[in-house]
Amino acid sequence: MLFHVEMTVNLPSDMDAERAARLKSDEKAMSQKLQQEGVWRHLWRIAGRYANISVFDVESPAHLHDVLSQLPLFPYMDVEVRALCRHASSIHDDDR
């Protein structure tokens, strides 16, 4: 199942700089691992915001929740999820 996920990160302004840097580093490593596994199919920065738009390829809504809730920055995110389905006019064979 494909899901469009918009994630906005809101780190507390008083968060220790070292903790913030560690969280960001851990998040980057985890996101790259999920991309290599094909779970996190697309990742796009939203210009001018600490936010992204992503496409996840997971088994179920519960699987998506498990993936998102394990992200190091998840406690500091506002997340919007939309289920996707293949468009009849798409020319891409890998749209599922």
UniProtKB/Swiss-Prot annotation:
Tell me the route in metabolism or biology where this protein functions.
Answer: Aromatic compound metabolism; beta-ketoadipate pathway; 5-oxo-4,5-dihydro-2-furylacetate from catechol: step 3/3
Enzyme Commission number(s) = 5.3.3.4
Q: Which SUPFAM superfamilies match?
A: Dimeric alpha+beta barrel
Q: Cross-referenced InterPro entries, in alphabetical order? A: Dimeric_a/b-barrel, MLI_dom, Muconolactone_d_Isoase
What reaction is this protein's catalytic activity? (S)-muconolactone = (4,5-dihydro-5-oxofuran-2-yl)-acetate
Q: Which cysteines are joined by disulfide bonds?
A: none
GO molecular function terms noted in the UniProt entry: muconolactone delta-isomerase activity
Q: Which residues form the signal peptide?
A: none
Which GO BP annotation is one of this protein's? Answer: beta-ketoadipate pathway
Q: Which UniProt keywords apply?
A: Aromatic hydrocarbons catabolism, Isomerase
Per UniProt, what is one Pfam family of this protein?
MIase
Q: How does it assemble?
A: Homodecamer.
Family membership:
Belongs to the muconolactone Delta-isomerase family.
- Please report the name of this protein according to its UniProt entry: Muconolactone Delta-isomerase 2
The organism encoding this protein is: Acinetobacter lwoffii
- Gene field: catC2
